[in-house]
């Protein structure tokens, strides 16, 4: 794992003015009541695995100590499983933090950000706080990243961001297209591939590519398929020199030991990913089939979320469903008639179908 150097800690002082300007997050809404069906944040309905919960409980006894050893151990295990060097893995308090630090490190007033739209908004927010130009490129007709258009959007770009599978659509960008982005991106820029949802899909990961490419950063999280959104553990994978540039902003901010040990236990549970992937796919496909049978269009998702064209202002549909206790995702401005739905449990998806049918019967 990349080490936190004295140099990076000193540089953090210079970075503080930038961090102070960051729009770290839009104000969070109050927690939903227990009886609400929460299909709005792409969370797992299952939470941490049994092994992860046990490891997290045991970690409480050591909470009086800084968990650096647990952090290094997690990085080492992930590196071993992926066939890469430990120095190519850095651990953060969620992959969102690593993504924000990447934008701060790789963009500036003369080196912009290129990303798709609709997509995850955090990099755009971070770039705007940096006063870096942002070029948002529409998804193509298959709802994948339009890589040729992204490559042409800004010849001086400092960072290209690809979320694969994409949030909010759940759709995939082909591996060959991502290779094209890596080969043809502006000189001196960094390609950041966000694989928060990759384990739900059938696509190969880009993690192994970091062995040959020092201008590629891959992000992973334990918030989605591992069900640990509240524990805040994420990974950045790349060349040590790239990770040092992130450490300037991340400093010595080690995640909590409970999350680190829960994450390690999750990686050690070899049955967890295939079980959850299959269960998610079953719930997703049966719901999409049901929605399409009623005349609505859905995105071809390989994630734990999908989008529906509701044929009317999406805000209205979100409000109607919320009134019946079913919370679904927000609206993306260039897709104003589409809603994002997180894939929940069997009970939650049954309730979603019941309420959706009742509220959309006249469409």
What is each model feature region?
Residues 49, 215-299:
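PLP-dependent aminotransferase class I/II
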Residues 285, 292-361:
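Conserved C-terminal alpha-helix-loop-beta "cap" of PLP-dependent enzymes
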Residues 13-65, 80, 156:
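N-terminal "arm"/small-domain region of PLP-dependent enzymes with the aminotransferase-like
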Residues 1-17:
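N-terminal secretory signal peptides and thylakoid transit peptides that target proteins
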Residues 105-162:
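PLP-dependent aminotransferase-like
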Residues 147-155, 171-191, 195-225:
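Active-site pre-lysine segment of PLP-dependent enzymes
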Residues 73-112, 130:
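Phosphate-binding glycine-rich loop
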């Amino acid at each position: 794992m990349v080490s936190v150097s004295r140099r990076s800690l000193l540089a953090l002082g210079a970075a503080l003015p930038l961090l102070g300007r960051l729009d770290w997050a839009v104000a969070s809404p109050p927690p939903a009541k227990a009886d609400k069906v929460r299909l709005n944040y792409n969370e797992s309905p299952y939470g941490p695995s049994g092994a992860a919960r046990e490891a997290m409980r045991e970690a409480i006894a050591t909470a009086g100590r800084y968990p650096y050893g647990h952090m290094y151990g997690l990085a080492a295990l992930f590196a071993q499983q992926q066939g890469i060097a430990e120095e190519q893995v850095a651990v953060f308090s969620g992959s969102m933090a690593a993504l924000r630090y990447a934008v701060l490190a790789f963009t500036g007033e003369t080196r912009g950000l290129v990303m798709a739209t609709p997509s995850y908004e955090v990099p755009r927010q971070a770039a705007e706080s940096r006063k870096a130009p942002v070029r948002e490129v529409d998804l193509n007709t298959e709802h994948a990243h339009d890589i040729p258009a992204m490559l042409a959007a800004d010849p001086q770009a400092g960072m290209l961001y690809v979320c694969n599978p994409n949030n909010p659509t759940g759709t995939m960008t082909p591996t060959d297209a991502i290779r094209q982005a890596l080969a043809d991106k502006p000189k001196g820029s960094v390609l950041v591939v966000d694989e928060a949802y990759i384990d739900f899909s059938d696509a190969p990961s880009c993690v192994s590519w970091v062995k040959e490419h020092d201008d590629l950063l891959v992000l992973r999280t334990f918030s989605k398929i591992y069900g640990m959104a509240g524990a805040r553990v994420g990974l950045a994978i790349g060349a040590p020199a790239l990770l040092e540039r992130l450490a300037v902003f991340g400093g010595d901010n080690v995640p909590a030991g409970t999350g680190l040990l829960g994450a390690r236990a999750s990686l050690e549970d070899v049955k967890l990913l295939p079980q959850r992937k299959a269960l998610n796919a079953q719930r997703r496909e049966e719901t999409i089939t049901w929605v399409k049978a009623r005349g609505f269009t859905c995105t071809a998702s390989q994630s734990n979320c999908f989008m529906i064209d509701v044929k009317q202002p999406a805000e209205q549909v979100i409000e109607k469903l919320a009134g019946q206790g079913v919370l679904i995702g927000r609206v993306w401005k260039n897709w104003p008639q589409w809603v994002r739905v997180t894939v929940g449990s069997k009970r939650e998806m049954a309730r979603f179908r019941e309420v959706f049918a009742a509220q959309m019967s006249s469409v």
